Each structure stands twice: as C-alpha cells, then as structure tokens.
Design a protein with these regions (language model features):
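Mature extracytoplasmic or organellar-lumen-exposed domains after removal of signal/transit peptides
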Residues: 25-194
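Bacterial N-terminal signal peptides
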Residues: 9-18
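Sec/Tat signal peptide C-region and signal peptidase I cleavage site
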Residues: 19-23
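Bacterial N-terminal signal peptides that target proteins for export
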Residues: 1-10
Length: 194
C-alpha cells in the first residue's frame, strides 16, 4: 500500500510539473495563465484528497508538503526541495498575486473589474486558508487530526475553484474564468449562474 501511495505521488507531481512547465514565461496571456492556475488548483485538490486518505502519517505529510510547495512556490517560506515539484515553480499564491495586478488592464468595463477584483481577493483568501490548513496538518502528530486538516485544506481549495453549490455562491476562480471567456478550455461545463 505504501509503495502504491508513493507511486501515485510521483505520477501526480509529474502532472503538476507538466502543467506548471506549460508556461512560466512572462509573455503568456492572462487567459492562458488563468487556465494553468485552474489546472494546478485541480491538482492541488487531488493532492489534498490523497493526503487526507493516506494510510500513514508519513504519507500524509509527503502529500501535504507537495501541496504546500504547489501553493507557495519554490521561493516560499515552507518550500521543501526534496518534495516535488523540485523545479522552480511560482506557486499558486504568487501566480494569483501576479494575475491580480493584470486584471484592471485586461478588463475595460468598471463593473467587470469590480466583480473580478472581488473574485481575485476571494481566490487569494481561500488559497491562504488552504496553505494554513496544510501547514497545520504537517505539524500534527495524530493521523486523524492531520486528515481532518487536509479535508479542510481540500474544502478551501474547492472554494477557490468556485464550483457553486445549491446553498451559497461565493465568486472565485470560475468568475475569473467566465470573465475572460476561457471555461471551455478546461473541458468542463460552466457552473450554474455563469
């Protein structure tokens, strides 16, 4: 079981690297970077799920650290080089901050800028909460508590991804994707209200 978990981790991180390497260059458009961010965020949700259901605390910590690396990037305070991705990556929080500086120029309409600004703040907040929960999981000594922290991490990542539920709607990443017309590139249906 332990070998299968580690093999899964390697496959997941190769996918993260492939998505991340798809464009670290400055010349990529806001739309392209949003699509990459969404793909990496989905990978983060997968890592959080794998961590939450890991059979051992060591396995959970491995996946939690991979997620911390994905969130913070290689220049992050909690980045650990031995845990994939080993290459330099900007991190979801850094990428979201960069994108936030480009939205006003990309959207001429004041109403769209306000909506996108709110969504961008929500995404950054949810990603920050996810990072805090993953770091808490790394410090836990009991697997049941660490698993709960990783489920909380998953919930924050899911909120950042913005798949609305029947009860409430909080604008986040899907609002950004709709604003830039790139939801089709993800091969997914647009959530209700989009």
């Amino acid at each position: 079981m332990k070998r299968a978990t580690r093999a899964t981790a390697c496959v997941l991180m190769l996918a993260v690297l492939a998505v991340g390497a798809a464009g670290q260059t400055e010349e990529r458009t806001v739309e392209d970077r949003l699509v990459t961010l969404a793909q990496q965020l989905r990978m983060g949700m997968t890592l959080a799920t794998v961590a939450a259901y890991s059979p051992t605390l060591d396995d959970l910590r491995l996946h939690a650290q991979q997620l911390v690396n994905l969130l913070e990037g290689s220049n992050g305070k909690h980045f650990v080089r031995p845990a994939p991705p080993a290459d330099d990556v900007p991190g979801l929080l850094v990428e979201m901050a960069w994108l936030g500086t480009r939205f006003d120029a990309a959207l001429p309409d004041p109403e769209s800028r306000a909506r996108v600004g709110n969504a961008a703040r929500n995404v950054r907040t949810f990603l920050t909460f996810a990072l805090e929960a993953a770091l808490t999981a790394l410090d836990e000594r009991r697997i049941d508590r660490a698993s709960t922290d990783m489920l909380r991490t998953y919930a924050f990542l899911l909120a950042a991804y913005e798949r609305p539920c029947d009860i409430s709607y909080v604008p986040a990443l899907w609002t950004l994707l709709r604003a830039f017309g790139v939801t089709e590139q993800l091969g997914a249906d647009t959530p209700e209200g989009g």
